[in-house]
Structure formats: structure tokens, C-alpha cells
């Protein structure tokens, strides 16, 4: 009788040990399915005078002045060349 109780206790213990990893795996999948705040993209747009200032900064970064010593990083030569091509 004692042997039967001991064996049944071991079987129940083994079943409980096997059930714990399954519950932990289910909890991990639940936390993985929730979207994180880090994954969201944010776009910012400007209207009015601020937009033109931001666009001017982008243009200045992409265009490089070929005569930096003459215009001393004011890029007046680039502005002149753009207005020449525009007309």
C-alpha cells in the first residue's frame, strides 16, 4: 500500500513538472504578442515657414559648396547656381 502511494506521488510530481514549462511558454507567447512602444514609427510634418526652413536645411546638407574659402560656408555660390538653373 505504501508503495502504491509513493508511486502515485511520483507520477503526480512528474506530471506537475511537465506542466510548468508549458505554462511558462504560454506566458512568454502572450508577452511577445503585445506590441511594444519602441516598435511604433512616428512621422512629423511641418506646414508654413517652418517647413521651408527644414527643407533648406536638407538642401544644405545634400549640396556641398565647391568654393568654401570664398563664401565661408554661407553657400551663396550654390544659391546663385540654383537660381541660374531655375530661370
UniProtKB/Swiss-Prot annotation:
GO CC entries: extracellular space
Keywords, ordered alphabetically: Antibiotic, Antimicrobial, Defensin, Disulfide bond, Secreted, Signal
Signal peptide: 1-19
Keyword Iron (UniProt): no
InterPro entries for the chain: Alpha-defensin, Alpha-defensin_N
UniProt-annotated location(s): Secreted
A Pfam family it matches: Defensin_propep
Tissue: Specifically expressed in small intestine (jejunum and ileum). Probably expressed by Paneth cells at the base of intestinal crypts. Coexpressed with MMP7 in small intestine.
Positions with biased composition (Acidic residues): 23-41
GO biological process, one term: antimicrobial humoral immune response mediated by antimicrobial peptide
Stretches the record annotates as Disordered: 23-43
Propeptide stretch(es), residue numbers: 20-56
Role description: Intestinal defense peptide. Has potent antibacterial activity against Gram-negative bacteria E.coli O157:H7, S.typhimurium DT104, and K.pneumoniae; and against Gram-positive bacteria S.aureus, methicillin-resistant S.aureus and L.monocytogenes. Remains active in the presence of NaCl and Mg(2+). Probably functions by disrupting bacterial membrane integrity. However, does not show cytotoxic activity towards human intestinal cells.
Family recorded in the similarity comment: Belongs to the alpha-defensin family.
Summary of subunit composition and partner proteins: Antiparallel homodimer; disulfide-linked.
Name of the protein in question: Defensin alpha-like protein 1
Organism name: Rattus norvegicus (Rat)
Higher taxonomy: Eukaryota, Metazoa, Chordata, Craniata, Vertebrata
